[in-house]
Amino acid sequence: MKILVINGPNLNMLGIREPEIYGAQTYDALCSLISKHAVELDISVECYQSNHEGDLVTKIQDAYFSDVDGIVLNPAAYTHTSVALLDALKAVQIPTVEVHISHVDKLEEFRQVSYVRSECVTAIWGHGFNGYLEAMDLLVSLARGISEDVTAPCTEDAVDAADATTAEEGTSCA
């Protein structure tokens, strides 16, 4: 099984940008955590980050031709603006989980709108880096035919993003 983890604009600045919201851990630490979890799950994973909307669209489209079984997508700011990402997800029809490190429901009102969510299996937010691992687990379960109710998005407090990699698992979004 192959999972593609796609991260949008400014996620390369993790640990620098607003650590009180997004935590003190770096993007490299996130990718390392994801890679280690992939080994535990016996799957392959690719982490990709771009600050450019068109590059993100191309990466989603390329996934269709690369035998990708699932996508973990943190579109970052493009969550709230990008019809192009929505259309790319519609085109490829690869199971996708939308992930956000922070509690997007507690940030500015405009950040509470997701253009991509309707094409995702579910959304996980507020679980810090652990949200990525939860998304990977969910996609593996779906691919292996393990039935789960994944229709309800996360709406409750779970963890403090400032301690994103060590916080206890909170409310499940699946």
Regions found by a protein language model. Name each.
Residues D67-D105:
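Mid-chain, well-packed structural core segment of small domains
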Residues E46-G54:
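Short beta->alpha junction loops
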Residues D55-I71:
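Short, electropositive alpha-helical surface patch
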Residues C47, V97, K106-V150:
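Short, glycine-/small-residue-rich phosphate/pyrophosphate-handling segment
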Residues M1-I3:
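Extreme N-terminal starter segment of soluble prokaryotic enzymes
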Residues I146-C173:
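Intrinsically disordered, low-complexity terminal tails and inter-domain linkers enriched
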Residues L14-D28:
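Glycine- and acidic-residue-enriched helix-capping/strand-helix junction motifs
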